Amino acid sequence: IANDLINVKKELSRYNIHIIHKPNYGIKLNINELERRIIADLVFASMTQREVFYDFLDTYLDTSDREIIEIIKNNNLYISDLSLADILINYSISIARNMAGHPLDTVFEDFEIFKNTKEYHTVLDLSRIAKEHFDVDFNDSEKSFLTLMLICKGSTHDKIYQEDQITSKLTHTILDDIYSSTLIYIDNRYYDRLSLYIQTALLRQKYQEKIRNPLYDQIQDDMPF
């Protein structure tokens, strides 16, 4: 048992999770609910390489009930197939954890600026589905998490860049570095595209989101350079 526990500790350390020994009470994982969600996502995402996952996804997409897909479509969000699979996984995890009595309690700073986005309105529709089908009420933390996930995983195609100081400064720095190194002047029409790319990249880093999978038919929008 001791050797098995050592191996478990090593495996969990990959996810920055540590075991706390409690005398007379066994062991406890030092981890919050958001970190549990991230690990669950990683575990299920590894199934995308197996036929069983695609069999499940195909079955889901072939059913008459395609409300989730239709909601994303009706809100004009552009998402690759791999990102869509990841969104379905995280949405399912959110529902399952809430049904088990473990809602998300993380406070997402400065979230108010995202409440006027298509992604937030999409999450409001998804919350309605969760309530109707599973009697689950998503709190503000759940809605914030799902909104940020959609923003990070979605394409920047057809989006309008909302100016913010940090992103704009970083964009100008990159363009200046390109010019000083190559004497290539980047046309202003690429400014918003690059700014959107940088903005979502910073969000992914801040909230530990996975790298975005671009839409290849819109690669110039998703990856300007």
Predicted regions and their residues:
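A cross-family "folded-core" feature that marks the main globular domain of proteins
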Residues: A2-F225
